[in-house]
Amino acid sequence: MAESQQQTIINLHNSGVPPDVIARQLDISRDEVDKVITDAEKSTKPPEPPSLASFYLDAVVDLDKAIKRAQERVWKALKVESRFDLSTEETQEILSKLAKTKVMLVILHIDLVGSTRLSSTLPADRLAAIVQAFTQEMSITITAYGGYVLKYVGDAILAFFLANDDKYLPCINAVNCARSMIKIVRAGINPILNQYDYPEINVRVGIDLGENVVVQYGWDTHRVDGKKLQIPHYDILGYTINIATKMTTLARPDQIVIGQMVYDVLDDRQKSTFHPLVISPEVWSYVSDYSQGIYRLYGTA
């Protein structure tokens, strides 16, 4: 069996594809698949490095350099070529290892403010260029802070930070990520948009912490060596995503809104940058599981 086919079997197995499905998709016997998997498992593998979210990353992210690179990429997207080469493959690999389990996650939701107005006033190509520039730069920033992009929903991005062993650092990284994203929009994206007569953009961010379930929703179809392969597609199901998404709608332009669970684990310096939000019960009525009162929200100034 060719080495490339063996690697394909291992990759599919590590993604959670059952051996029977691998054999059927590659048109080989189940015994051949089992042998490749067994041989791979016998080999000594180094331990997986800890998630970046378990380190304090604001100290190592060079924001000035990130802003400069964002300007360069946005300029290319608007004037030279429009490229989007980001992938959620790493996200799917992480989720495949957590399939059918409950996991503690920090959920970050960011979206463009006034996208409806933009879509009604801009030609399709200019709107697409803005959304693509925003999506790419925000995704790069999420990755830099140890997060994973879960999905793109129109002009919004859903991301998560693993928080099973420690809640403080993932929450801090998510909050600092949000702060950096706003700075990159203001100093990295908007100056280039202005330069070429595009409207400036604003964003809003919602962040919350909670338990979620990793589930498989169907299959992604790929072609490898001319053969059609089906790989499980994983997603996250949980109350936290609903709350974070709703929180984002309550944020002002360029504001970060966090939930009570995130606020409670922040240090005093970080807490001092947030203030309680006073919201009508008709607009916000989520009940906290542990206080049994209305789930409190906090926003930046």
Regions found by a protein language model. Give the residues of each.
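Catalytic core of nucleotidyl cyclases, primarily class III adenylyl/guanylyl cyclases
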Residues: 145-170, 189-236
